[in-house]
Regions:
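Domain-level detector for long C-terminal conserved domains
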Residues: 176, 180-337
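BZIP DNA-binding basic region
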Residues: 1-2
Length: 337
């Protein structure tokens, strides 16, 4: 009987996946893809779950489960980043909050930049004030996330109205199937890696896309120096431990650990996430600190996806999330005898 009930559950999930795919191609109007605008500073965002987030961000009400699944499939990317970096994050150092002591140190540095105090500046000459540089979020191994509508990524800027962002998509597939939209510029001394730069996607957000491996860029010092107050790495479903892709990360991970900046990682399933953690433990044992314990992502996609080559392989975008950073060795003083 238990096997039969499990079979029915799988059938229901497969039916849901099929209906969601047909819904996307139905040609209907999608009100769930109309996104909320800037957030009033007096209105606090509640990041307990998807419902409280969408409500406090003043999204149009989403009254059907299917529309909710379609909306979260895109929003999971910026909101996953925002939910970890924000000062009102659902992840904390309290018992069961998953954040470690080292994680609190790293995220506190970024939050200091992302939530600056009011400067009292104005539009005139007398109102000029020094501003912090933008927070750089390096999204490595970028695939589908690099081609998301820019309105989706602007949601990240709305969560931090006083901060500036520079999103940098890096990876050989970061411009896949987008040649008609953005032809790759030639490599020149002023643009040595042929970056596609989208300036002013929002007044506080800039997006760059580079079709290359990160370790190639790192070795040139192109993004040097790195600062834990201004830099963060994001790896969406990187497949660190997957047999087909782990070799592509062997050169990259040691370089990321050198920067001492936080590295956020998501996985399609619990197995996928645990496989990545096992691979990092094997290749960099003793060289990293865990910032956030692995577990289910509060803002995972609610829509399930099916592997066409294996119907038993069911996953969802950003199901799990964890974070780590290169180990920092604090200076110690040896008292003179």
């Amino acid at each position: 009987m238990a096997d039969y009930e499990a079979h029915l559950e799988i059938c229901d999930t497969l039916r849901q996946i099929n209906e969601d795919d047909h819904d996307l191609r139905s040609g209907r109007f999608f009100p769930e893809f109309e996104y909320a605008g800037p957030q009033m500073e007096e209105a606090i965002v509640n990041m307990t779950n998807w419902d409280t987030f969408l409500y406090t961000r003043n999204f149009e009400a989403i009254n059907s489960d299917r529309s909710m699944r379609q909306a979260t499939r895109l929003l999971t990317y910026p909101v996953t980043i925002g939910s970890i970096l924000h000062e009102l994050s659902p992840y904390s150092i309290r018992s069961g909050g998953r954040l470690t002591a080292e994680g609190l140190k790293s995220l506190s540095a970024l939050r200091y930049t992302l939530h600056p105090p009011k400067t009292g500046g104005g539009e005139g000459i007398k109102g000029l004030r020094p501003e912090a540089p933008p927070v750089r979020i390096f999204i490595l191994g970028a695939r589908a996330e690099s081609s998301l509508p820019r309105d989706v990524w602007v949601q990240l800027a709305h969560l931090f109205p006083r901060a500036k962002f520079h999103l940098i998509f890096i990876g050989p597939e970061s411009m896949a199937n987008r040649d008609d939209e953005f032809p790759l510029p030639p490599r020149a001394p002023s643009n040595p890696f042929g970056a596609v730069v989208e300036d002013r996607v929002w007044p506080t957000m800039k997006i760059s896309t580079i079709v290359d491996y990160y370790h190639t860029l790192h070795e040139t010092g192109y993004f040097y120096p790195y600062d834990p107050y201004f830099d963060c790495f994001m790896l969406f479903h990187p497949g660190l431990g997957h047999p087909a892709s782990s070799h592509e990360w062997e050169e990259t991970i040691p370089l990321l650990l050198e920067t001492k900046a936080p590295i956020l990682v998501t996985g399609y399933t619990q197995y996928d996430m645990e496989r990545d953690i096992e691979w990092v433990n094997k290749t960099a044992k003793g060289e990293f600190d865990l910032l956030m314990e692995p577990g289910e992502n509060t803002f995972r996609s609610l829509r399930w996806d099916l592997n066409d080559l294996d119907p038993q392989d069911i996953s969802c975008g950003n199901w799990g999330v964890w974070a780590f950073r290169g180990k920092r060795y604090e200076t110690t003083r040896k008292d003179e005898a």
